[in-house]
Amino acid sequence: MSIYYNVFWTASQAENAPLYKRKLQKGINNFVFTAYNTIVEEITITQNGFDGLYMSYLYGKVRERFSFLPAECGLEKQGERTEIAFKTDGEYCPYVRKFLQEHIADVIAIGYKYEFFKRRLSLPLLSGEQKRLLLTALVAADYREDRAYVAKRLCGFEEYCLDGVFHFRLQELKRRWENIADYVPTDMTESSVDGFIEFLVDDGEGKLYIKNGKAYDADYRLLSRSLLTGVQSPIGEVLLGGAEQVYCFGEVDDRTRAFLKKYYAAKAVFC
């Protein structure tokens, strides 16, 4: 917590995604279950409230990752409740569950946390863009620790209820977020935001690539976690990726270029 005290408290003294209708498809890849002796299992994810962004994100991820499996995957919204149902051969379910737990952890450690700070912090002296940068940086600062903590709390579930897990099994995490928010002064200024982002950049590790407006990790996997903050962008991916160096190929939009030149300087390479 001393990080937030040093950066914010000291500085302050100086100054949808669209929802899908239920569409239970006969196999993600148009496969059908033909092995009658196969034990089919169902993995269910539910959420009450919110605008469906997180569930649409998870639905897209699981469909894309397991498109090769004989499976059924559906997304349904009924009033305030949204449900994802994934059915496949029982032998594949441990792999699907592990994948979903990792991405549910992303939803909470990024999406829920961003929304938490957005509601908790007013920050009247910051522009909309500066506030978005700060909120994303706050999420990124403890992203790996938060994600690991959430993933552990998801083990052993037959069904995953996002809001239920968040409100009843992650109270310690919520208290940590409250403590962080208490260190952020209402009169936060742009220079304080700059100082915090510069601190994160100095503490970064590894590499991240941007090619034609899309971000990739060190293993060249396409990144889309910033979508969980409501807007997918290279800048969001850079902050959430926690990279020490950024390599850019092809066209780079003016906003991303300005961000990298300001905060990364020589650590950003334009090829």
Model-derived regions, located:
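C-terminal structured domains
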Residues: 218-271
